[in-house]
Every structure is written in structure tokens, then in C-alpha cells.
């Protein structure tokens, strides 16, 4: 029997529903249960693929090519269970599906309404493909009281009736603010949030209360009394030094025990949290610190690089060092000739993905600085494209090398595959048309050159990595670039698409077209990030 746990949030946004959901899933998984997490997003966009990074943060890409909410990254990192496009539904997707059904005549002339048609579609999205699971945890985006969330709340209310109380549970995440002048935690916001939830017909069975300090028993009983839950079901979600402490912290508060008790399942045996304890030990007892400069273009909102930040921390865990990130806006290198010297103290330099011309010349300067000063370098997606252009301009005698993303160029080192392989049977994009759905998305196979650094890093020559890009490195320039010293050490199986480049004579210089950060886990760091941070450690010890 599949059990559904619905996680809602109240009082304020950004309380950490995604982390809480992932932590609970990890605890249930540590007890041997099969779990899956899903996210319902109340925005009207079909997916976040065309949303600004400043608006939405990172777009997390799944193996099957879905562009999803960044919370799905947390789900994967905490559980190791790969998400699919079925695990993220938006209002835009739901409405598009219902309207398409109406146009086909599926509703047989009925008046199409939010109830039952939209809510039925939401319920279908929640339960689809969950037959072989023990638990499905469903996070409802937004905050209770938002008008956008109402159809989703109504749908999960109906699901409790459809499935029965024995198969469903509602967990509500709230805030307990500390008021210094009063010297106490205030419970009134939580009470009002629960009342708001009750107004739409939902009674929470557990309250997860965010707080920067323990909840006194008197306040716990008060919350339980006013909010109609058991005192044991008032769980303190205390602030912790790292998100990876949440499973251990929530278990200490009895969260997983209370969930199992609600469903009438055995809860006497302790979960196996040994992997989480090893992660925490490595993070809390580092043997050094490395400084990595990240030269980006969305540094005003670090959520745009969420998976990257986590993957670098995973590399630190693998090497038992603390990773300190120095965020550098690429454009500063274009405005000042001396600004590039800020990279001199870095133990490693990373140029991440991005879109558009802004900051591209600054990134190219950062690539050159890393190459010329023997600083470990990792380029990702757009970062690889800039590394290739830098090589073409400064080593291969092609000063006009550029990307067609920035405009017409005589030397299109980077371009849409349609521009330099027109007619190829492997083309997956449309010229022109809508921006959504025009990228290379999802997991693709690649082959690595025998004896290359990247093959040594992976320990194998066949890999599968996730992509999200519209432009490709032009394979027609491979020969001239390799003569200049840049090895094409990873290619698509058909030898059409360059996947990895490296400088064999550099201490550690690797650039990849894909996004390795999307597959990294705290207890299973991605080899590229383990190797990159390891190279930074060697550089640190030489300084």
C-alpha cells in the first residue's frame, strides 16, 4: 500500500519545505522504505525553463529531460532516487493538459471547471506511477493563503477522502519567531496558519516548526492544543549548521517516528543514519580549507547555482576540506584591467553555465588566467564554450573566434548544431519558434578518450551525464584546436558533439559541456568535483 504525505507551508515563504520533505524521505529510506518525492508548483509557467535565474533560481534537469524546480535537486541529493518529469507538476502544465483534453472533446461537451476537472488532473499527477512505492512525499509550493495554491490544496483534500485517512498524512511547516523584547517564542503565527489550512478543509496531523532555539514543553503543548494535534506531533525544525544535518536533527526530534506511528507502522527500530553521520563528520572536522573562485553572471542570487554549490561541498567532503567560495561577477574583468588579479589567490577557478553575451569576455579572461597561471580549472557548459573560444583566440591563431549566440561571426567556434550540421539526422532542435523545448536536455551518453585525465577521474571511458544547453562546440574546429594543445577527450558516441576538453600539460584543466553537478550526492560525490577540489588542495599546499 502506498502512503502519501503532503507537506504544506505557512506564515512566510522560504522556510525550507523542500529540505524538510527531502529529510523526511531520507529518514524513511534509512528504515528500508521505498520513497519518492514530488513537487506541485502553483505558478502558471509550464516549467521554469524560460524563467529568469533571478526570478526562480536554478532549473534542475532530470534524466528524462524535464526542466524542474530546484527542490527536485534536494530530493535527489538526499535520497539518491532520480526524479522524472512526472515528479514536478505546475499550474501551467495542469491547465495546458485540461485545455488540450477539452479541445479533443474528452469532456463530451461538459462545462470545464476548476472543480472537478483541474483538481482531478492534479490528483492524477500525484498518484500516477506510485503503485510500487511505500511512501510518496508531495510538497505543495507556495504558502497557505496564496490564491494560486487553492486548486492544489483542494485536490489533496479530496485525495484524503479518496484514499482514506490510513493512506494520507498532512504535515504543515510553520515559523515560530523569537521576539527578543518579549523573551519568548510566539505561537500566534502558527495558530493562524493552521486555521487558514483548516478553512480549506485540511487538518494537519503534524506541525514542523522552524525555530532558532528549542521549543519549551509549555509552548509545545499550547501549539498542540490550539492546532488540534498531538504534542508529540509538534516537531522542532531547529536551525542547523548544514542542510545535511536535517535528517539527524529531525530524527532526534521524533519526526520519522511520529509519521510511522500515524500510519500504524513499526517504529521501534532505529534508522541507519551512518552515511549521514559520516558526511557530517567530514564537514564538521575538515583538515584544511580551499578557496575556489566562481566566475559567474548570476551571482546576485546564489540559488541560481544551487546544485553547483552543493556539488562543490560534496567535493570538500570527499577530500575532508572546507570549501570557501569566492563569488566573482564576470563583468568586472571587462571593466578593469587589474580586476583579474583577484583570481591570483584562488586555489582553483570554476566558470559555470549561463546564457547570453553578458559577462562572456570576463569569463574568457578568467579561463586564460587559469590556463596561464597553472591554476586548477573546471568549466561547465557555457564555461566549456568559453574555454574553447579562449584557446582559439590565444593559442590557435583565430582572433575572431566567437559564438553565434552573441551575433554573426567569421569563426563560429560555438553555435546551434543546426548552423553547422544542418540536415544531420541527429538534430533535435527547431530553428526559430518558441524558446521552450529547443535545448538539448536530459541524460546523454558520452565516450572518454583512453588515457585522458577525465577518463582517469571517472575510472571508466563510458559515461552518462545531464545536459541543458542550446549551443554546441563546433566539431569542425577540433583539429586546429588539438594542434594548439587542447585535447577533445570526450565526445558523443557518434563523434559529432564535443563533450569534454582538457589541457594534458596543465596541472588540472577540464571543461565539460554537460552539468555534472546535477548528479552529485553528499554520500556519493561526483568524481569531477572530487577531483577538482582535490586539485585545489594540492594547489593550496603548494602556496
Curated annotation (Swiss-Prot):
The entry's L-glutamine-binding residues are: 54, 354, 382-385, 405, 470
UniProt entry tagged with the keyword Kinase: no
Q: Which Pfam families match?
A: CTP_synth_N (PF06418), GATase (PF00117)
| Annotated catalytic residues | 381 (nucleophile), 515, 517
Could you name the domain of life of the organism this protein comes from?
Bacteria
Which biological processes are named by the entry's GO terms? 'de novo' CTP biosynthetic process; pyrimidine nucleobase biosynthetic process
What Gene Ontology molecular function terms does this protein carry?
Answer: ATP binding; CTP synthase activity; glutaminase activity; identical protein binding; metal ion binding
Q: Which residues bind Mg(2+)?
A: 71, 139
Q: Which residues does the annotation say bind CTP? A: 13, 146-148, 186-191, 222
What residue spans carry the region label Amidoligase domain? 1-265
* Binding sites annotated in the UniProt record for UTP: 13, 186-191, 222
Quaternary structure and partners: Homotetramer.
Something else known: CTPSs have evolved a hybrid strategy for distinguishing between UTP and CTP. The overlapping regions of the product feedback inhibitory and substrate sites recognize a common feature in both compounds, the triphosphate moiety. To differentiate isosteric substrate and product pyrimidine rings, an additional pocket far from the expected kinase/ligase catalytic site, specifically recognizes the cytosine and ribose portions of the product inhibitor.
Protein family: Belongs to the CTP synthase family.
What biological function has been recorded for the protein in this entry?
Answer: Catalyzes the ATP-dependent amination of UTP to CTP with either L-glutamine or ammonia as the source of nitrogen. Regulates intracellular CTP levels through interactions with the four ribonucleotide triphosphates.
Q: What is the designated name of this protein?
A: CTP synthase
Organism field? Gluconacetobacter diazotrophicus (strain ATCC 49037 / DSM 5601 / CCUG 37298 / CIP 103539 / LMG 7603 / PAl5)
